Amino acid sequence: MIQMQSILEVADNSGAKKVMCIKVLGGSHHMVAKLGDVIVVSVKDAIPGGKVKKGDVYKGLIVRTKTGVVRPDGSTIKFDQNALVLLNKQDEPIGTRVFGPVTRELRAKKYVRIMSLAEEVL
């Protein structure tokens, strides 16, 4: 579960490496974000020459969490890190590649574009 001040890895090639959650979107009582939720993040670490700079504020879609997700058949999928994909104002991915696996639950949230960019779908 991701909350304010959580540090996350960036799973795309936008140029950012680490970001910090500054707001969880989705209502006044939405305190934590889970897999597939959109949050507002600030870039804390970026590579030189990338599309984003340190201090920039973007939306991000969470694609991997340490908490994981429970499937309807009872199986659980957990990851070693919390990771997200940066989104622009139109909720489209900034990067052109997504590194690492993503889950099938993103299809239900209408993020098929990110699933097609990913290396592996679990």
From Swiss-Prot:
MF GO annotations: large ribosomal subunit rRNA binding; structural constituent of ribosome
UniProt keyword annotation of Transport present: no
Keywords: Ribonucleoprotein, Ribosomal protein, RNA-binding, rRNA-binding
PROSITE patterns documented for this protein: RIBOSOMAL_L14
A GO biological-process term: translation
Matches recorded under HAMAP family: Ribosomal_uL14
Function summary: Binds to 23S rRNA. Forms part of two intersubunit bridges in the 70S ribosome.
Subunit structure: Part of the 50S ribosomal subunit. Forms a cluster with proteins L3 and L19. In the 70S ribosome, L14 and L19 interact and together make contacts with the 16S rRNA in bridges B5 and B8.
NCBIfam families given in the database record: rplN_bact
Name under which the protein is recorded: Large ribosomal subunit protein uL14
